[in-house]
Amino acid sequence: MNKNLKEAPNFNEADVQLREKIRKQGLSLGFDWVGFTSASKNLTHSSYLAWLEEGFAGEMNYLQKHAAQKTSSQNVLESAQTVISVACNYFHDDTPTLKFQDSSRGRFSRYSVGDDYHLVLKERLKEFRNWLLSEGLASGFEQTRVYVDTGPLLERELAWRAGFGWFGKHSNLIHPKLGSWLLLAEVLIDSKIPPDQPFSGIDCGSCTRCIEACPTGAIVSDRQVDARRCLSYLTIELKNTIPKQYRSKLQNWIFGCDICQEVCPWNRKAPKSSDSTWKARNGLRDRKLWDWVRLEQEEFSNQFRKSAVKRTKRRGLLRNVVTALSACSHPQALSGLLIGLRDEEELVRKHSAWALGFRRQRITKSILWRHLRVETTEQVIIEIQEALASKLKHSIKRERACLLTRQVSLALARKHRLGPSGGNHRRSSHNRRTKLLQD
């Protein structure tokens, strides 16, 4: 290792050339962007703590657990001097997102349709670290760390400080040329490498498309997201029941959500990745929602082997599927919910019952009544009862509306028979006849 490089407070041309050599190596390993920043105190830590204090993290308790460590990268590696921030573009033409406006098909976030990025990037980072060690750019293996999304680091700040781009109003980082379809990762080393300049000069301006497009209003303020409302959190991180006020907002998203990125103008010209790792797996593009409900555990494990989708487990994915079926207009949707209502998982049955109650088909009422007789789990029974109560309430409203419509129709018909002046027309005619007789 170059000891002078590690200890020097200033950098010379040779140091800059070394940085560019490292950057070139990172790009050759499959990263689409490589940047450098110092392992100093983080600038956004107080904002991060305030976000946690607001409860915006929902049930992601692991974020609170490591919050104190995130004040500085040196809390995870005391000897760290430099953070090498890297990013991979995962945007592919065949990703089933915007093409899947068809409500009968389940939609997955772009990042999840290929191989699990945690595994892919971790292998590339290890290769990068081995090269850095071979070049003497770290004192030893123990003086390095590699992280992909899971470490106690403020990844977006590190990437911003390393010159990546700016914080979009949806809170994702936006690169001026690559857009926001990128995955971040880091290598920490104990050598001082000249840092890149933090990004500046461009931001979102007056654009609010992501804020307006979010179906649940999860973007509560500029660059701040309430995860408890976010469809990605609700379909992935939340392990149990989805709050009722958000269920109908899922549309046909069954793993994650990309709406805020899809509407972003900076992603219109985002380059497409040539890396086949991120291509959609077979079976994701054409499978209908009601076919996903038939997914058994063995098939789930095979379909999503080394995939980020495994995070939800089968029960979580099927919970999302039956919830999405509530808004599917295809006749087969009902058959899918019937299967969901008989699933072994309480969570799936519970959301199937809600979805049947949400659908305005008369047959769903009798289906719920029949299942109520055989259901043994209290939470599912309560869900069925609430679904039936909702249907009764809707039925009463419908009957009242029909009665009101009938009354209006009768009134209009009566007015039509009596003429434009109604009953007064009949009385005035009688008065005219009486006057003629008197004359």
Q: Which positions does each model-derived feature cover?
A:
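Short, charged low-complexity linear segments at domain edges
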Residues: 174-199, 227-246, 297-301
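Short inter-helical turns and helix N-cap capping residues of alpha-solenoid HEAT/ARM repeat scaffolds
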Residues: 314, 344-345, 376-377
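Iron-sulfur cluster-binding cysteine motifs and their immediate structural context
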Residues: 28-31, 209-233, 239, 253-277, ...
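C-terminal amphipathic alpha-helical segment
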Residues: 246-278, 299-310, 316-323
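Auxiliary alpha/beta "docking" domains used to position bulky ligands
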Residues: 1-203, 251, 370-378
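Amphipathic alpha-helical scaffolding segments comprising HEAT/armadillo-like alpha-solenoid repeats
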Residues: 299-303, 330-341, 361-373, 395-400, ...
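Short, intrinsically disordered C-terminal tails of secreted or membrane-associated proteins
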Residues: 434-435
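Structural detector for internal amphipathic alpha-helices that build alpha-solenoid repeat scaffolds
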Residues: 318-329, 339, 349-361, 381-394
